[in-house]
Structure formats: structure tokens, C-alpha cells
From Swiss-Prot:
GO terms for biological process: propionate catabolic process, 2-methylcitrate cycle; tricarboxylic acid cycle. Keywords: 4Fe-4S, Iron, Iron-sulfur, Lyase, Metal-binding, RNA-binding, Tricarboxylic acid cycle. Its cofactor is [4Fe-4S] cluster. Its EC number is 4.2.1.3, 4.2.1.99. It catalyses: citrate = D-threo-isocitrate; (2S,3R)-3-hydroxybutane-1,2,3-tricarboxylate = 2-methyl-cis-aconitate + H2O. This is Aconitate hydratase B. Pathway: Carbohydrate metabolism; tricarboxylic acid cycle; isocitrate from oxaloacetate: step 2/2; Organic acid metabolism; propanoate degradation. Substrate binds at R194, S237, S238, R239, Q405, D406, T407, S489, R788, R793. It comes from Helicobacter pylori (strain J99 / ATCC 700824) (Campylobacter pylori J99). Monomer. It is an enzyme of class 4 (lyase). One of its GO terms (cellular component) is cytosol. Gene3D superfamilies: Aconitase, Domain 2, Aconitase, domain 3, Aconitase, domain 4, Aconitate B, HEAT-like domain. The gene is acnB.
Amino acid sequence: MKDFLEDYKKSVLERKSEGIPPLPLNAKQVEAVVEILMKDPTNAAFAKELLIHRVSPGVDEGAKVKAEFLAQLSQKKLECPHISALEATTLLGTMLGGYNVEPLIVGLESQDKNIAKESAKALKTTLLVYGSFDKIAAMSKTNALAKEVLESWANAEWFLNKEPLNECIEACVFKIDGETNTDDLSPASDAFTRSDIPLHAKAMLKNRIENYEQRIEAIKTKGVPVAYVGDVVGTGSSRKSATNSIMWHFGKDIPFVPNKRSGGIVIGGVIAPIFFATCEDSGALPIVADVKDLKEGDIIKIYPYKGEITLNDKVVSTFKLEPETLLDEVRASGRIPLIIGRGLTNKARKFLGLGESEAFKKPSAPKSDAKGYTLAQKIVGHACGVKGILPGAYCEPKVTTVGSQDTTGAMTRDEVKELASLKFDAPFVLQSFCHTAAYPKPSDVSLHATLPGFITQRGGVALHPGDGVIHTWLNRMGLPDTLGTGGDSHTRFPLGISFPAGSGLVAFAAVTGTMPLNMPESVLVRFKGEMNPGITLRDLVNAIPYYAIKKGLLTVEKKGKINVFNGRILEIEGLPDIKMEQAFELSDASAERSAAACVVRLNKEPMIEYLKSNIKLIDEMIASGYEDKETLKKRRDAMQAWVDKPVLLEPDSNAQYAAVIEIDVAEITEPILACPNDPDDVATLSEVLADTTGKRPHAIDEVFIGSCMTNIGHFRAFGEIVKNAPPSQARLWVVPPSKMDEQELINEGYYAIFGAAGARTEVPGCSLCMGNQARVRDNAVVFSTSTRNFDNRMGRGAKVYLGSAELGAACALLGRIPTKEEYMNLVSEKLESQKDKIYRYMNFNLMENFRL
């Protein structure tokens, strides 16, 4: 006891010096707290406060110890002089769900009427009851208090007893001009602290503005709630930590939940879709409105029901809250609590023979004269058990495949615990360790040791550090025409559809097997024509924003930003026979368009080829000891069933799109690349070289070949171009996306070529692409095959171009961006005659002696 108190008080002081609260108690610490309460009256008051306020809820390990102790007190099996049986029952009711539910159900039958009533009162506000609902329903036939609990749920008292949003909200503006991406709000270099919300929040905006801590603290002294305001807010990664940081600074404490806050206000001219959804999930109020007349320090009034923002009693901006259920979401403390609670209310009403509840806002049916459905609308419809879902409709589709990666995995674990779940209902949940494998910190090593078991115990599948990028694996676990999600903005399946999400929604999807969705509109990109020699899939990726800019559907300028793709589904057709790895290049880059999702219309043949390969991969995973075996077997069997009877959904010819962009690939005669530092700022090779302003530098310091945007063909092509050439003129990084690619490249002799070229080869994974571990040199000019090139992402002050591996090889040889002629000559000389050999893909079922 003494050691615990000394150690704990020391840690409190250490964190207080940083301006943050102590960490929540772990299981051993809770055991020590219980011992103090039972044996040490001198420190009992302090220990009681810790037990009440410093233990995470749900199925956290500490919550188990807390619930078991309180249950013994509530049931009078144990006496504590500092917590009565009645108070113990009350405290059980603060734990949200999980380990506290069974003791409260037992309490309904207590001989002590006060404890029985208190148990009922606690259960009325407990939403995370899952299978225990049936137990309470059965009890209600003979137990009046159990029936009272059901009636309370049926009447949505848990919701109606919460205060609705005020008619007028006074707030102080904290404004970041231009674009704020999620790396600004949650820097990759601090990814290892993400699950420690208060500590991670200290890094918010440190790379974006000067004196960031003083500026944030100064705005909090205004005495009114703070609204985070920006022209464009939340682009980039799906990291919920970005939202957590805003809420930590500007939100409200959650009673009995340590180190977490909810609420807060975000106002943006454009709010990226994943970030918007994460705000919804967390109980924040996201508002899309013109912000040009809002300045930092302004005291504004927000009228959420009227849709007006006033400054000095003058209307300076108007808005319409969307989705229609947003006010309910805020009232319920978030979209996820609303969905769970609404489901509980409906279940109780059905059991009691009551009609539909009138307590909640019902989404209106979408107003549309559409007669047909797009491919995306049909896939989502299929996941909902209907023919299609039109834009504007609210739905909760079944989720077939869920992905979680390591820099968000610890947060997802915390969210799963908070959801009080011990089993995943989603058929396939995959956890990777791709972002922290290369240069793990002690916290990463701990995560590598503890997270796999947490996932596999719940029926998920855990990869190993060094296996490679999550998307390379998760794509191979997908099924045609099904829906998925993942805690990474590049969760963009090349088959079916996936809606990336923050860690909270990923946990919800894994736990429940469903996810909420307000169906977005679709933008159709239709390719036609034949590709010219030297033109790559990556050039087609960059052609999408290039042609959108031409049509006035996309602007690079952030103020008054136009982006036809933002929040919509990108649907791509016209390339029906490309391989799945190539299709992923297209779907993956929809993240940089800020699209909600992407579908690529393909023929059956590439899908059959891909699934046959993936069946072999799963067989080898099982043979190599990957867990959970049953989950892997079920997914393999589902793949085989589709291969045996392959049927694909098709879009209707009369489907409607928000916009149609047609791209004749024959018009593309030279590479297209994204320029520093914006994935929307695309230009042809000639246009880049013609730019003498200095914004598009021509000398290249470093070249990176890697990320989820690459496949084995890119590395062979790169190798062939640099083969037998003098060592690279630029610092060179080579990082295959998976250990399977790495081994095959070694077997084929390409690693020897990379070494001779002076390349630094890394563990398969995401390190340099994300910039959370390896970094390019400060102020370097970089050519990269990676996903995005936001300021400071790959290195402080770095200027980063994005393009193909083939163009990267030319940059490496020359130390500069080549001319069109130089590039075409290299490709023609080195690649053209052996294209079939170079651009072969990883068909494991056809590879001799393939083993993991």
C-alpha cells in the first residue's frame, strides 16, 4: 500500500508539471486502492476518490477489479467502512456497462429495497447491456423493477433526461487560417502517445503555428466555450486522436471517465468527411459554414436551430446542420451512444409490444428522382438487405471486414473496452503493426506484446510486426460486393467498398458488425482510350485531380476551396481488366481527394485471380500459426464460395451522379505528379520544369519507393531502371509493402540491385510514409511514391512530389526531375521490352513452394 501511494503521488506530480492529469489506474493499482479502503483509514478518502474517478469504465482490466469489489459491497458479502452497500450500487451505475451489469441485475432481486431500487435506477441509464437484455426481459415477467427498467429504456428516458442543445451558444473563435489537416492536430511524430489523450493533446498544432501552447491556453481564458474554426478542417488521416485533442482542449469532462472529454464545436468552410464523422461519434458539434468573416478572439453566437452565426448581433454566416440527426447526436453525447441507446429503446419497445419511439429525430427519406442505383449504392444496399441506398438516406449496413493499425490500435482497444465488448460481431477484424515496426519505442514494444492477444481473444486476426502495410493484407481479406471499414484513411478496398473511420467507429463496427452511414452522393470518373507507352497507373491517379481542376470542379486554393470529391463516393470505371493491385492505386488515392469512399468497377476475372491467391495466403497463415484460426477459415471458405459462383453487382444505366469526369488516357502523353506540398496541386512533367518560381524545385535530394500505393511491379521497374547505373544522385529509400514482396524481391536479385544503387532498405511498413519514425532530412526536396505530401509529414520543411516508381527511378539517377524526353528514353530502353516480366503480381497459388 505504501509503495503504491508513494509511486502514484510521484507520478501525479510528474504529470502535473506537464499540465496533465495522472493516467487512469491499471488493475494492480485498483487492487491497491481496494486494499487501502479496507485496511488504511488514514488514506481511505483519497483511495475512494481514485476508485470513483480514476478507473476507466467498460471492460477495462481495472474496471473488472472495481466492479467485483463494488458488487461484493452491494450484495453485502463484504463490508467497507467508507462505502456503504447503497453507495456501492450507485457507483456500479457509473461504469457504463460490461462488468457492472451482472451485479446490477443481481441487485434487482436484493432483499434490501433501497439497493433494488438503486440497481434499477442505475440500469435505466446503462446502455451497454448486450446479451443481458434477454436476462432482464425474462426477469420482467416476475420482477416489477426489471419491468420498470425495460419501460424506462422503451420510453428513452436515458435520452430525454439529457439536456437538448441550447437555442443559442456563445463561443469564442479559435481560428487557423487555410487548411488544418489531421497531422497538424495529431502529429505523426507523437503517434506513440495517442492513447494518452491529455499528453498527446499537448502536441496539437505544434508544427502548424508558433507559440501554439500559449495561443491555445490564452483562448481558454475568455470564459466561454471555444469554437475551433478553419477554412478547411480535418483533411488527411482518419486518426480520432485529432478530434480527441480538440475536445481535450475545448470540450467538457465526462463524469466518471478519466482523461477523456466530449463536446466541443468545430466550424469549417469545408470539413473532411472522416473527421466530421469522428466529431459526430464523439459528441462534438461540427458545422459547415462560411468562415471568412470570423476572426480569432471573436465572441460569436451560434444558433443551431436557426442555422445562423452572429457577431455583435449581426449575422455573419449561415448554415444547415447535417445530418438531420445531429442535434440528437450531440444531446446523446455522440452518434455512437445514440445508435446504441436508440437500438436498446427499440428492442425494449418491441419486447413490450409498443410501436416505434417518437423520442428521436427520424431521418427524412431522400428527395430524389433517381430511377437507378450506382455501383456503390448497390453495394451499400446489399449490406443493408435492399436493392440500393440513395444519397441522403441514413442506413446501418453490415460490416464484413474491419481493419485496425497500430498507431490507432491502442485507442481502438480503449474504445472496445469502453463499449464493454468481449467478442467481435464483425466477421473479420484485422490488426496490423505496420506503422511502428521499423523503429519501435518502448511503448510500441509493449503494444506489440499486448494488443495481439486482445484482438485474437475477441475473434480477430493479428498480424506480426514486419509483416507489412495493413492495406496490402486487408485488401486480400476482402470479399467482392461487401462493405468494410478501418482505422486508417487509406482503407479503400479495391473490391467492394470501404468507409474509413476513426478508432471509435472502427471499434463500434468491430463490436456490433454494423456502422452508421449517411449515404453520400457519387462522382463518376470514366476512363477511356489506350494508355501511351511510359504512362503508368500512378499517372492516371494524378489525372483525376488534373482533369477535375480543368473542369472547375477542384481548386488548389484553400480559401473558398472547391472540391467535388469531398464527402462523396468516387466511382471509377473504364479499366475493367486491371489487376486488383492496380485498382487499389486508384481507390487508395481517393483518400487524398477527401472522398468518403471509392469503388472500382472490374470484371470477374481479376477478382477470381486475386481471391485464388488470397485463399492460398490464408492457408499459409493458418499453417504458420496466425490467430484466430476459426476466423481465418471462415473467411477462406467465404472466398472459395464466391470463386465457385462468381456474381458481381452492376450499376444501373440510369443511375445519377453529382458529377461525371471523363478522362481519355490517350491524351496523357507524359507523367503527372503532385507538387509540393498538396496532393491536389498536380502538374505534368513539362509544367513542373517550366515553373521557375521556386515553388516547384527541380533538384531532388531524396527518393522514396514504398507505401501502400506500391506493389511488387513498381520495385522491379525501379530496379531495372537503376540496374548497372552509377549510384543514386539522391538519398534513396526502398520499403516494400509486405514481407512477401520483400522475400520475392530478394529471391529475384533486386535487393542486390537496390544495394548497388545506394538504397537504404527498410522493414516492410509505413514508417517513412507517415513520418512517425524515419524522416527525410529537414528542408529536403523529395520525390515519393507515397500517399500524401502535407507540410512536415515526411520531414520538417520537406518539399515532396508524389508520382510513379518509374519517375522516381529517373529522379534517383539524375538527382533532379527529368525532362519528358529523358524519362521516356529511360522507360523505353529499360522497361518496354520486358513489361510482362516486370509487372507480374503476387499470385501465391501459382508460386512454387510459397511459404510465409
